[in-house]
A protein has these predicted regions:
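Charged, amphipathic alpha-helical coiled-coil/dimerization segments
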Residues: 21, 71-138
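Residues within the alpha-helical elements of helix-turn-helix
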Residues: 43, 58, 76
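C-terminal regulatory/oligomerization modules of transcriptional regulators
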Residues: 1-2, 123-155
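Short capping segments at the starts of secondary-structure elements
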Residues: 47-51
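Pre-recognition alpha-helix immediately N-terminal to the DNA-recognition helix
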Residues: 8, 12, 19, 23, ...
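Short, locally clustered residues in the helix-turn-helix/winged-helix DNA-binding domain
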Residues: 17, 42-46, 107, 134
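N-terminal leader segment of winged-helix/HTH proteins
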Residues: 1-31, 155
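Residues within helix-turn-helix
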Residues: 52-53, 64, 71, 91
C-alpha cells in the first residue's frame, strides 16, 4: 500500500467499525442494551470486581459515559456495586445472575453479527484479520485486552 493509496487502511477500518457498531447497536435493542452497556457487562464478566473507570480506559470512552452506562445497568439489576476493600473512592462491579443471562444472549447476538459481517472472508482470512487486529490493539491500547482469563475458562 502506497502513501497515496485511497482508501487508506484507517478509513477502511473506520468504515468496518461503523458497519459492525451500527448492526450490533440495532440488534442489541432486543436486550434493551446500548453498545456501552453491552461492553460494560462483558468487561465485568471478564474481570469481576473491575471499576467503571477501568472499563472506560479499556473501552476508550470517557469515564462519565461509562459511568452512565453502568448506572443504568445497576438500576436494571444487571450489575451490582460493592465498595473496594482498599479505596473508598472506587466501587467494584459484579454481574447479577440476570446480568449474566442478558450478557450471554448479547454475546450470541454479537457473534452472529461478526459472522454476518465477515462472511465474505475465508476462515484463513478471518484468522489473519483477527491476529492483525489483536496485535494492533495490544500495542495501541493494551488495557483493552487486560482481562482475567480465569473467568473465561469458567464460562
Amino acid at each position: 500500500v502506497t502513501d497515496a493509496a485511497f482508501p487508506t487502511t484507517g478509513y477502511l477500518a473506520w468504515q468496518f467499525s461503523q458497519i459492525i457498531a451500527g448492526r450490533l447497536e440495532r440488534a442489541l435493542r432486543a436486550e434493551d442494551l446500548t453498545l456501552a452497556q453491552h461492553n460494560a457487562l462483558q468487561q465485568v464478566l471478564w474481570t469481576p470486581g473491575v471499576s467503571a473507570a477501568e472499563i472506560a480506559r479499556r473501552s476508550g470512552i470517557t469515564a462519565q459515559s461509562m459511568g452512565a452506562a453502568v448506572s443504568q445497568l445497576v438500576e436494571r439489576g444487571l450489575l451490582r456495586r460493592e465498595p473496594h476493600p482498599t479505596s473508598r473512592r472506587s466501587m467494584r462491579l459484579f454481574a447479577t445472575a440476570e446480568g449474566g443471562a442478558v450478557a450471554a444472549r448479547a454475546t450470541s447476538i454479537a457473534r452472529r453479527i461478526e459472522r454476518e459481517t465477515t462472511s465474505p472472508l475465508s476462515p484463513d482470512d478471518k484468522d489473519s484479520i483477527h491476529r492483525l487486529l489483536y496485535r494492533l490493539v495490544e500495542e495501541l491500547n493494551p488495557d483493552a485486552l487486560a482481562i482475567d482469563t480465569r473467568s473465561l475458562n469458567q464460562s
